[in-house]
Regions:
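Contiguous, structured surface segment used for ligand recognition
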Residues: 23-150, 481, 497-516
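Flexible loop/turn segments at secondary-structure boundaries
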Residues: 58-59, 163-165, 191-197, 259-265, ...
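Feature activates predominantly on carbohydrate-active enzymes
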Residues: 94-318, 334, 359, 468-473
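Conserved, mostly hydrophobic/aromatic
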Residues: 50, 116, 155, 176, ...
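Flexible, acidic glycine-rich loops studded with aromatic residues
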Residues: 371-378, 383-516
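Bacterial Sec-dependent N-terminal signal peptides
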Residues: 1-25
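Active-site neighborhood of glycoside hydrolase catalytic domains
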Residues: 265-270, 280-402, 407-416
Length: 516
């Protein structure tokens, strides 16, 4: 259903602000790289002409829609030189920053220039925020030069635990775009649900998308609500969502969990599992023992067939394969898996996982895709239920083109991955997990998160692609409960991803939220 607060966060940032005098400094979210206030104002007319370069028609249409939401009428023109708002592609504008832009409000017009359509789009988001700050349509004259601090500015939504639906996802994409976040990480499969249609394996959604009950209250409560839960996206719906995101310059990175967090898939096709036994899609949350039989070529082929359909759907250059929280018990107890390990000189279960991951990574590379996974894919010991013996690595090393999504373990492991030459995205759970309550991660803690570990050289810093914040869904059954945890903290992560460190100021940021 369409909830009444579909754009509540956008409104909180814009429409209910108090006008500032033109000569005063302006605080935006995220804060631009450079903002120069100039004397004078520009009064927007009731009807606004928008001129655009030929490659910017979709951006111009979106700008027109945004302005109409602010009760302005608009007319679109291709190449009109005297339009009130002018969108222009210019190869000489911030050529080193393809997401960068310049925005100038003069006494005559508003110009947004960039070397890319993405930069133009982000300039439009800044203009939206400025217009929202001045409901009397008297905009201060200014000049903004803006570009992101990090190339990866991500929000992850877990729908494997609770399905939210297309309308909610599109609303979240709108809010991400407004905050200049460019990556939607979509967690579509896990133990408790499979949410993506795979035509070659229809039971993945016929069986895997349904569970008969859900654990409530907290992990290990063993209290269940007794309510069936189901839902999945057809490939048609996914294509529509991808297009919606593309128009907002957001890349969607799908996550298909392997070799663990596989219970829903194994419930659908028991032969995928190491034990080849029938199970139900679990309603209990937490880490489960069922894992794919990575020693079976039929299972490996099935996983590649699944990924083939995923690749055909998602234009993303990056595919996330999960790889987290794999319990090794079934592999250690399986004669078939043990024989496979002996044949391939794999000494430990962690080596087996890295061996499997390398095979998937190489296969994805052959399809023009780059693999990403949670930092267990390096083979490091992250969990108390793992032994040092099981996680010892001798003969297998993760390929250097893999992206390591760092979420847990000793914080030094992030620096270690970078020193070993891997690109990383910092998603350290103590700072970025949106399902944690505000006592655990208050707004200020979220805001001050720095994804760059201390002690890196200049050359090593380039391996930090950026930051992601995660909305895990185990105990987030409703959109309302999700939104309470998501807003306003997502704005803090957005500013961390976009704004230069020198421009960040929590007091100003929090005051901006209060007065908007």
């Amino acid at each position: 259903m369409r909830i009444t607060y579909t754009f509540i966060f956008l409104l909180a940032i814009t429409l209910f602000s108090f006008p500032l005098k033109a000569e005063e400094s302006i605080r935006l979210i995220p804060q631009p790289a450079e903002l120069q206030m100039q004397s004078g104002t520009l009064i927007l007319p009731g009807s606004v002409d928008i001129s655009y370069s030929s490659a910017l028609k979709k951006e111009a249409i979106l700008l027109s829609k945004y302005l109409q939401e602010s009760k302005l009428t608009t007319k679109l023109y291709s190449g009109k030189s005297d339009a009130m708002i002018q969108l222009q592609i210019s190869p000489t504008v911030l050529p080193a920053y393809k997401e960068g832009y310049v925005l100038q409000i003069s006494d005559r017009n508003i110009q947004i220039k960039s070397s890319s359509s993405t930069g133009i789009f982000y300039g439009i988001q800044t203009l939206r925020q400025l217009i929202g700050k001045y409901p009397d349509q008297q905009l201060p004259q200014l000049f903004i030069t803006d570009y992101p601090n990090f190339s990866w500015r991500a929000f992850m939504l877990d729908e494997a635990r609770y399905f939210k639906g297309k309308e909610v996802v599109c609303r979240l994409l709108d809010q991400m775009a407004y905050l200049k976040m460019n990556t939607f990480h979509w967690h579509l499969t896990d133990d408790q649900g499979w949410r993506i249609e795979i035509k070659k394996f229809p039971k993945l959604t016929e069986i895997g998308s349904y569970r008969d009950s859900s654990e409530i209250n907290h992990f290990e409560s063993d209290v269940f609500d007794g309510k069936p839960h189901s839902g999945y996206y057809t490939q048609k719906e996914i294509k529509e969502i991808i297009e919606y995101a593309r128009e907002r310059h957001i890349n969607i990175v799908p996550e298909i969990e392997m070799p663990g967090h596989a219970s829903a898939a194994i419930a659908s096709y028991p032969w995928l599992g190491t034990n080849n036994e029938s199970i139900k899609v679990p309603g209990k949350f937490g880490v489960h023992y069922n894992v794919y039989n990575v020693a079976d070529s039929k299972v490996l082929d099935a996983l590649k067939d699944i990924l083939t359909e995923v690749i055909e759907l998602f234009p993303s250059p990056i595919i996330h394969i999960g790889g987290d929280e794999v319990k090794y018990n079934q592999w250690k107890e399986s004669p078939v898996v043990q024989a496979y390990m002996q044949k391939h000189a794999l000494q430990t279960p962690a080596e087996l996982q890295v061996h499997f991951t390398n095979g998937i990574s190489n296969w994805l590379s052959s399809k023009g895709k780059r693999m990403m996974g949670w930092n267990e894919i390096t083979g490091s010991k992250l969990h108390e239920y793992q032994s040092s013996t099981d996680t010892a690595i001798q003969n297998e090393k993760l390929p250097k083109n893999a992206i390591v999504h760092c979420w847990k373990g000793d914080y030094s492991l992030i620096k270690e991955a970078i020193e070993n030459g891997y690109d990383i995205v910092n998603a350290y759970h103590e700072y970025t997990y949106l399902d944690y309550d505000y006592k655990t991660i208050p707004l200020e803690k979220a805001y001050h998160f720095n994804p760059v570990p201390e002690g890196l050289t200049v050359g090593q810093r380039i391996h930090v692609l950026g930051v992601s914040c995660q909305m895990w869904g185990e105990f987030i059954p409703t959109v309302e409960s999700m939104d309470k945890l998501l807003f306003p903290r997502i704005a803090a992560y957005a500013e961390t991803g976009w704004s230069l460190e020198k421009n960040k100021n929590f007091q100003q940021f929090s005051e901006t939220l209060k007065t908007h």
